[in-house]
Amino acid sequence: MNNSINHKFHHISRAEYQELLAVSRGDAVADYIIDNVSILDLINGGEISGPIVIKGRYIAGVGAEYTDAPALQRIDARGATAVPGFIDAHLHIESSMMTPVTFETATLPRGLTTVICDPHEIVNVMGEAGFAWFARCAEQARQNQYLQVSSCVPALEGCDVNGASFTLEQMLAWRDHPQVTGLAEMMDYPGVISGQNALLDKLDAFRHLTLDGHCPGLGGKELNAYIAAGIENCHESYQLEEGRRKLQLGMSLMIREGSAARNLNALAPLINEFNSPQCMLCTDDRNPWEIAHEGHIDALIRRLIEQHNVPLHVAYRVASWSTARHFGLNHLGLLAPGKQADIVLLSDARKVTVQQVLVKGEPIDAQTLQAEESARLAQSAPPYGNTIARQPVSASDFALQFTPGKRYRVIDVIHNELITHSRSSVYSENGFDRDDVCFIAVLERYGQRLAPACGLLGGFGLNEGALAATVSHDSHNIVVIGRSAEEMALAVNQVIQDGGGLCVVRNGQVQSHLPLPIAGLMSTDTAQSLAEQIDALKAAARECGPLPDEPFIQMAFLSLPVIPALKLTSQGLFDGEKFAFTTLEVTE
């Protein structure tokens, strides 16, 4: 755990210090004083009564001794509870299908003042240009948008076709950027464990910052070796004992609750007073519909309190202070003198009802964020341009030949989990022996002109129609699932025509589609408009059968080879446990 102050992220001039100290001593006027407020004590538990005094971006003082202190403006909290701004320890903003600017508009009023983002989705499509755009967005954001430098582009060398490389030389050019906190998730954990020099070079280059991990289900000597390499955290744990063992071995545990991967119920029982400094909250991938209707990190805090009886100060601790300490952001995470004034006022701390948000010492107005969104997006110079270098397809491109009596591998989906199982199914003249089997294909979209990689999918719940998308981790090729080759082709051709996006086909017609013009990953629409369009997509998808709660997000992970057990990339079926390609027909 990175507990040292990283001065890279704590810029305060001598003049600012003098002004701050003068207000702390009571010799100068504060910019803001928040009155009629109780402060949740994340260190000792309980509450601290008294005002919060703000000068510039920082907290100058806390407590009853400032009751009569002068201020340019006073904020009446009306009995609210004040907590530090929430921090998401690991996410890919692109997976929300929002730009970083729109994401800020949607989440900052909910108390999410800081995010630790890995932009490897857009980097896989556009390379360094995608990372540079995220850095521009972070520089102009009110929200603290920090970046981890994407470490595995593509996720696993030689297993998929992606749009660009991101070399160590390019990575190093961003290491000292003021918004960069470290190295993003090192997904090639077998390569790290085996000591591949190219991966160790990346770890060595960023060792003075934070090194993110990714090791679902890993244990035994392999987990020890992975941690020994310097990996500091993991957000992929999905079993209680797995999470406990990682904590025992010194790893910090990111408890994830996204739109597809939902691990909070499994891991929340681990959180206690002792280990909470080693526990953090993250979303990884969360769509705008869920953000609008359920919330973001605020939703996770609410569930910890209401469903898992986590004490208030511990729930808010893992949502702020623990993450700030882990990433060396010691100017964040507490409401204390000298800390950045990222403050969430709650009218109900148990229900996480946000009354007002301040970031860097300034109150946030949601309407102002919305009004400025278009201009701020334009200022960031988004990397527009069609990234779909694929000609339209026909039904014959998805033709598979099966022999009666033969057994074939099936990717078996687990609803609301990223892992899959590998099972087999016997084909007869009447079809497969399980009626849940449908077809899946991945088509590379970067001009390599490869034939579609085709396979079988079970457990997804698709009874009719087809779904297609260019959001397909991590290489973001076109993924399509369907019951008929004709409808699969129709869905794929719609997303090609849109320049990237999502599509639902049923009864031989496009029922709903969502263009994603930035890298085939993100929309330029407002968060509200995007949420409405996703609602329409989900409604259309539900007509195709009892699908996962978030069918497109779940589908997006069916081609990610670094999560077991069986996946399909543009190169073919991949065994995520043996880390090797395998055949559709079972011949063993």
UniProtKB/Swiss-Prot annotation:
Give the reactions, separated by semicolons, that this protein catalyses: adenine + H2O + H(+) = hypoxanthine + NH4(+)
Database matches in SUPFAM superfamilies: Composite domain of metallo-dependent hydrolases, Metallo-dependent hydrolases
Q: Which cofactor does it need?
A: Mn(2+)
EC main class here is hydrolase
* Subunit structure as annotated in this protein's UniProt entry: Homodimer.
Record-linked NCBIfam families = ade (TIGR01178), PRK10027.1 (NF007457)
| Protein name as it appears in the record | Adenine deaminase
* Organism of derivation: Escherichia coli O17:K52:H18 (strain UMN026 / ExPEC)
